[in-house]
Amino acid sequence: VECGDETKADKYEDMMLDVIDEGYHYIVASSTFRDVMLKLAKEYPENQFIIVDDSMDEADIPDNVALIFYAQNEGSYIVGQLAAGMSESGVVAVNVGMDTPVIADFVTGFIDGAQAYDPDIKIVKAAVGSWTDPAKMKELCLTQARDKQADVFYQVAGASGAGLFEACKELGTWAIGVDSDQYAYYKESENPELADIILTSMLKNVGDSVVAFFEKVENGEAEWGK
């Protein structure tokens, strides 16, 4: 197993080519890498590629590619209810890195959950336009608090989400994390005070699903091309 952590989009392909050249057969990456993964799947038909947290038309999926996707709307529904229940202003915010079909599913679930708890709740939503711009995210949240009175914030924004936590700490408002236990992460970080404003995190347990997929590979039950 080799892990790569390249964050520059123009370096994604080089990173994957490196591991292919080193003899790795299975390549696993998130939906951020979809275009590169599909390109390499055609160029390296003997390799197999697993794209995590993505969905697309089955007709467009090569035979050596598998997708793992989730019902993120369901977890977001629950934290939407939590956000509405904790809000004192009656305004909650959901801020994302970029608008994609998967992210839209997060947002829809959050909105549905908040409105199920309180039909009169107001919801503001914005996209930073990047997964790696915490400064812009922080400014966005501060503006939403000032202009819209938002007082509970949910982030689905990758590394940009750090700016939401910083804003909530400054504002004294609640934040909700995603994908990992961000309370635990910040509690052990150089900024443990950020943990104090995190209500909870919406987890999809991506790691568990990848392990489960490879158990199917080992048993000859994995499905490719879908």
Q: Model-found features: residue ranges?
A:
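A residue-level marker of the well-folded mature domains of exported/periplasmic proteins
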Residues: 1-226
